[in-house]
Amino acid sequence: MDNTSKVHKLMELAELARLPRRKEVEGAVIVIKVGGHAMVDPAARSSIIKDIVTLRELGALPVIVHGGGPEIDAMVKRMGMTPSFVAGIRVTDDETLEIVRMVLVGNVSPDIVSLIMRHGGKGVGLLGSSGSLLIARKKPMEKVKVDGKEIMVDYGWVGDTEQVNTSILMDLLDKGYIPVISPIGYDRDGHCLNLNADTVAGDIASALKAGSLVSLTDVNGVMMDPSDKSTLLSHLTEKECEDLIERGIISRGMIPKIRSSLCVLKAGAHSVHIINGNIEHALLLELLTEKGVGTRLTLK
């Protein structure tokens, strides 16, 4: 970074320091789930990571959990397979698990870490086996309602987080790093499991007693009508979320996102935010201004 760039950066930080909620992020752990769809566009991806590095420079302690849905789907199709989902969860057989590992650990995570470095931060990629970060258990078969009918579903090599080793994350945060976590866990017998990135972000936020959880997606937030941006719901309580799920307004992949968000709030987080990562500086606007740009969830 040359001297001119450094001066511009200092001026930018000074402006951000005057925003209404700047003090709320200082010293706070902020878990940021970056969705695969929000990271497809290279310019948006770079902007998101730049804002995360800026939060670190403002005194926040960001932790990134990334997905990779579009990239995984593309590779699955390239291998002549068809992506399979039930209730927003990817059904993961042996071949799909190998693709998930290859894409997340080999492509998505290194790309995010390199962008952090490019914007002046220090990133480090992690997965469940890194210092036993994510101990998981295989998801059992369960009854799921599909098209009005209950069916038994075997998700394959899909897991739920059982334990989060927070010490490795806190050590990295204390040393100035931004952890970048791939949602791949291991059970106590060493079997690899595909984890839902939204759920992992929630589990990590709960374990770290994070101040906020932010989910960056390719939608503006929770909307009464997904095709009409004017129906964005800027604030929702737990009761309102449950009602919208029951009515089918919150559906598909948004359900695990909301469920994990509510668990994070019950664990002590002040707020959870669902925002569109394709909006320029959405992360900073949501966390540092009163109005925000997406949907803010609170218990009451």
Swiss-Prot record:
InterPro entries: AceGlu_kinase-like_sf, AcgluKinase_fam, ArgB, Asp/Glu/Uridylate_kinase, Glu/AcGlu_kinase, NAGK-C. It holds the Pfam family AA_kinase. GO terms for biological process: arginine biosynthetic process via ornithine; L-arginine biosynthetic process. Its EC number is 2.7.2.8. It is found in: Cytoplasm. Keywords: Amino-acid biosynthesis, Arginine biosynthesis, ATP-binding, Cytoplasm, Kinase, Nucleotide-binding, Transferase. GO terms for molecular function: acetylglutamate kinase activity; ATP binding. GO terms for cellular component: cytoplasm. It is an enzyme of class 2 (transferase). Pathway: Amino-acid biosynthesis; L-arginine biosynthesis; N(2)-acetyl-L-ornithine from L-glutamate: step 2/4. It catalyses: N-acetyl-L-glutamate + ATP = N-acetyl-L-glutamyl 5-phosphate + ADP. Its main location: cytoplasm. Substrate binds at residues 68-69, 90, 194. The record marks 33, 257 as: Transition state stabilizer. Transmembrane segments: none annotated. SUPFAM superfamilies: Carbamate kinase-like. HAMAP family: ArgB. Belongs to the acetylglutamate kinase family. ArgB subfamily. Catalyzes the ATP-dependent phosphorylation of N-acetyl-L-glutamate. PANTHER family: N-ACETYLGLUTAMATE SYNTHASE, N-ACETYLGLUTAMATE SYNTHASE, MITOCHONDRIAL. This is Acetylglutamate kinase.
